[in-house]
From Swiss-Prot:
Residues 860-874 have a biased composition (Low complexity). Its main location: cytoplasm. One of its GO terms (biological process) is formation of cytoplasmic translation initiation complex. The gene is TIF32. This is Eukaryotic translation initiation factor 3 subunit A. It comes from the Eukaryota. PROSITE patterns: PCI. It comes from Meyerozyma guilliermondii (strain ATCC 6260 / CBS 566 / DSM 6381 / JCM 1539 / NBRC 10279 / NRRL Y-324) (Yeast). The keyword ATP-binding does not apply.
Length: 891
């Protein structure tokens, strides 16, 4: 590892000082580039985090001021990569990213305050979409005020910058247990950003980003080498993720992004299922309330009411619930339950074949074991006495729609009055539409039991509730009748020519009336349908009366069948057990095969991904190298052009020659310099010739001037001598007068002081007499103090000398020990070298003897038989060892 701070220019304090100096001279981009190069360098891995953090913070400030989002993102990634293995590296990263986001938010707030506008809530602009030429042209020719466009240009870039900052920071902090608290904080800030500025497109992208992060957490392999991995089994971690998803759900509902809200509900339910800890009741109540709103938007009345039912179960247990709130939510629960449309008897009320999976999914979101029904919800309301909390008008509506109090021809006015009263509350008002349709269909069903034919106008009038804010028109009522007939709630035909409605009832089909609808009377079709059942019952009673033994025979046969079943139950149980074993074995074999197949697929996928990543890395490295070379060539070319242009401008500025700055392609710096030098040499030669001629002319002129001025110089010298003599006499007289004056003043002062000398001497003697003892005492103390100081200094010098001698002795001993160890190592090394040399000599001698022996053996074999000589067989290790011992014995 290289020592830290080896290069003076690489020290953090020097880099920081350099950046501050550049900022002071208003070169912020240069300072940013300096800090960026330092932060992204791999050499900072060996520096202290405390030294790097101020540099990273200053870099973030400059990047935000200059709006360099991509540079800041890359710097943050590199900073995390370089310091994350340090002890406090990740804490420093969190401080830096928080500072980055805070600065971006502050800039956005300042820009918005400077623009002094409110962000247009209705304009859903995508922050990731850059301006197109068409949009620029449209903004230029539009009638929008120029000041408004300028103000928007101030705010929108900072909106985009802050959004990119959120994305970059979340990508840096994701999937790390040490940064999950800061990650959660940034997520909440991003949610508030989307809600504050109504950024629906960005909110969708943010939700997808968070889902990708949690998907990575759930699918990442749990290996021992994984550091700082997110543990979803930890209660605090799962609670943080739940808080994030609940915030996401609340914001999506407030932004009216219902599809995203449903996905958020699914995310919350997945986390709740994975969590070992039950969420807080307040959070679950909020969950069910938002789910009810989502179901209301999707027109799913059944699950809308079921969600309000789950919400009220939790809310009614809250100690903070007031009577008004309980009454409000209970009324909503009852109204939503009454608004559930009834289903016909020819379809399964709980599970519709086309929506089986959907209903099961929605039931699981509500934590229900089975699909709810209208009947079960009504029974729940009655059994839990929820009607005691509801508003009086809602309770009265529930009683009116009861099974025994529903009269189709007289109930219309009463229901209309209740609807008018319910419409006064804005939260109850939106249930009137579905209640109107449900009540109308039920009225039509009751009428179909009483009448066979009615007038169409009469039937339509039964579905129009006058006096309410929401009422159906005649065409809408007719459409409702057609839909009810299509769904199987009614069986009728409409003759528009005569305006007559005919109710149909086939005796060979199931009743089309809903099973929950009370019957006013039994229709002829019902009588025909039950005739066969009554006939069978009568025949059974007749047989029992004619032949009393028939019952006993049936009982005996039943007992015999039971005995046979009991006798064969053990064999059947054994067969079942064997079948279970076979099935388990088959299942185990299938599981093993599937697991092997999955492992093989995972291995192949991992290898493929590794190969793709390696190829991608190689491609990126090659691309990066190519771009670097191209950038270097461009920079070199640009530098050459700049230098060429600069030289040409200097030449033009000096006026040496005139060069066309727009036509420099065929010229390089060397040619320009040669042209400049040639022109300078030419100018120099011309100047020298001019100077030579001028100097020759100047010599003759100067000689004439000097001859003419000689007569005037002599006269001037005489006048100057006379003037200097006068000046000397004047200065001399002034000095003598001043000296006399000073002497007289000093003599007078001496006489004045002489009169004071006797008094001064007497006063001095008195003072000396008074302070004589004190002066002696002070002198003695000073002398004693001086002696003590001398003695202490002597002792200090002795101690320092002793310590110095001891230190020298220790250093000498240490040096001797080091020298001894060095000599010992040298001796051992020399000994080892000597042994190696001797061993090599022995090996050489052995090789020579072996060659002699082999030659002797070969000569003997050649003498015995003239056959072709065989190749020398290499000696084994045992033969070599034996030969070595023989040689050692001979020596």
């Amino acid at each position: 590892m290289p020592p830290p701070h080896r290069n003076h220019n690489f020290r953090p304090e020097n880099v920081l000082k350099r950046a501050e100096d550049l900022i002071a001279v208003d070169k912020r981009e240069a300072a940013l580039e300096t800090l960026y190069e330092f932060i992204t360098s791999k050499r900072i891995r060996y520096l202290q985090v405390e030294d790097l953090e101020p540099i990273a913070l200053l870099l973030m400030e400059l990047a935000v001021d200059l709006r360099k989002g991509k540079l800041a993102k890359d710097a943050l990634h590199q900073y995390k990569k370089n310091v994350q293995m340090s002890e406090n590296g990740l804490e420093s990263v969190q401080v830096v990213v928080k500072r980055f986001v805070d600065l971006a938010e502050k800039k956005l707030n300042d820009a918005q305050a400077k623009a002094d506008i409110k962000i247009d809530q209705d304009e859903d602009e995508d922050l990731e979409t850059s301006q197109t030429p068409e949009s620029i042209l449209m903004s230029a020719v539009s009638n929008t005020d120029t000041a408004d466009r300028t103000e928007r240009e101030l705010v929108t870039p900072w909106l985009r910058f802050l959004w990119e900052a959120f994305r970059a920071v979340l990508d840096i902090l994701r999937n790390n247990s040490k940064t999950e608290v800061t990650y959660s904080t940034i997520v909440n800030q991003a949610f508030q950003f989307c809600f504050r500025f109504n950024r629906k497109a960005e909110f969708r992208r943010l939700c997808e980003l968070l889902r990708a992060h949690i998907q990575t957490v759930t699918t990442q392999p749990k290996t021992a080498g994984t550091t700082n991995a997110i543990d979803l089994s930890d209660s605090e971690t799962i609670q943080r993720y739940l808080d994030q998803r609940f915030s996401q759900l609340n914001i999506s509902v407030k932004l009216e992004l219902w599809q995203e809200s449903f996905r958020s509900v699914d995310d919350v339910h997945t986390l709740i299922t994975a969590s070992k800890k039950t969420p807080k009741p307040v959070m679950m109540a909020n969950y069910y309330e938002n789910l009810a709103r989502i179901f209301a938007v999707s027109d799913n009345g059944l699950f809308h009411a079921a969600a309000w039912n789950k919400f009220f179960n939790l809310y009614s247990q809250s100690p903070n619930a007031t009577d008004d709130e309980l009454s409000h939510y209970a009324s909503i629960l009852v109204l939503s339950t009454l608004s559930i449309p009834q289903r016909s008897s020819n379809s399964n009320e709980t599970v519709v074949d086309d929506h089986r999976a959907k209903n099961a999914k929605l039931s699981s979101l509500l934590n229900l074991s089975h699909v709810p029904t209208r009947d079960s919800l009504l029974k729940s309301i009655v059994s839990r006495q929820i009607l005691s909390f509801v508003d009086p008008c809602v309770k009265k509506l529930f009683d009116v729609l009861g099974e025994n109090n529903f009269h189709p021809l007289t109930i219309k006015k009463e229901i209309a009055a209740l609807f008018k009263e319910i419409e006064a509350d804005k939260d109850y008002k939106h249930y009137i539409k579905t209640l109107t349709e449900v009540v109308s269909v039920r009225i039509f069903q009751q009428v179909s039991q009483v009448y066979e034919t009615v007038k169409l106008d009469f039937l339509v009038s039964l579905g129009i509730f006058e006096g309410t804010e929401y009422t159906l028109s005649a065409l809408e009522v007719e459409n409702l009748i057609a839909i009810a007939t299509k769904e199987g709630h009614l069986a009728l035909t409409i003759d528009h020519e005569s305006g007559v409605v005919t109710f149909k009832s086939s005796p060979f089909e199931d009743s089309l009336s809903d099973s929950l609808t009370s019957r006013l009377q039994i229709s002829p079709a019902e009588l025909v349908r039950s005739q066969l059942q009554k006939f069978a019952y009568t025949l059974s009673k007749t047989v029992d009366t004619i032949d009393p033994e028939n019952a006993r025979r049936l009982e005996a046969s039943r007992e015999a069948a039971v005995k046979r079943a009991v006798a064969g139950i053990s064999e059947e149980q054994e067969e079942i057990a064997n079948r279970v074993k076979v099935m388990d074995e088959r299942k185990r074999v299938i599981d093993v095969a599937k697991r092997k197949q999955d492992e093989e697929a995972a291995r192949l996928k991992s290898e493929r991904l590794s190969a793709e990543q390696k190829a991608e890395q190689e491609r990126m490295l090659a691309e990066q190298e190519r771009r670097s070379l191209e950038k270097l060539e461009r920079e070199k070319h640009l530098i050459r052009e700049r230098e060429k242009r600069k030289i040409a401008e200097e030449i033009n500025a000096k006026g040496i020659i005139k060069i066309d700055l727009d036509n420099l392609e065929n010229l390089d710096t060397d040619k320009l310099r040669i042209m400049q030098i040639e022109q300078l040499n030419k100018d120099k030669k011309n100047l020298e010739e001019k100077l030579r001629a001028l100097s020759k002319k100047t010599d003759h002129t100067e000689r004439a001037f000097r001859r003419y001025e000689l007569q005037y110089l002599e006269k001037d010298a005489e006048a100057q001598i006379e003037q200097e003599a006068k000046n000397y006499e004047l200065v001399k007289a002034n000095k003598i007068a001043k000296a006399k004056k000073d002497f007289e003043e000093a003599h007078a002062l001496k006489e004045r002081f002489t009169r004071l000398v006797p008094d001064y001497s007497e006063f001095k003697s008195e003072i000396n007499a008074k302070n004589k003892d004190k002066l002696k005492q002070l002198q003695a103390e000073a002398k004693a103090q001086l002696e003590r100081a001398k003695q202490e200094r002597i002792e200090q010098i002795k101690r320092e000398r002793i310590e110095e001698l001891a230190q020298r002795k220790r250093e000498q001993i240490q040096a001797e020990q080091e020298e001894a160890r060095r000599r010992q190592k040298e001796e051992e090394l020399a000994k080892l070298k000597e042994e190696i040399r001797l061993q090599r000599e022995k090996d050489a001698e052995m090789l020579k003897r072996r060659q002699n022996v082999e030659a002797e053996v070969a000569s003997r074999k050649a003498a015995i038989t003239p056959a072709a000589p065989a190749e020398a067989k290499p000696m084994t290790y045992a033969e070599k060892l034996k030969l070595k011992r023989q040689q050692a014995g001979r020596s």
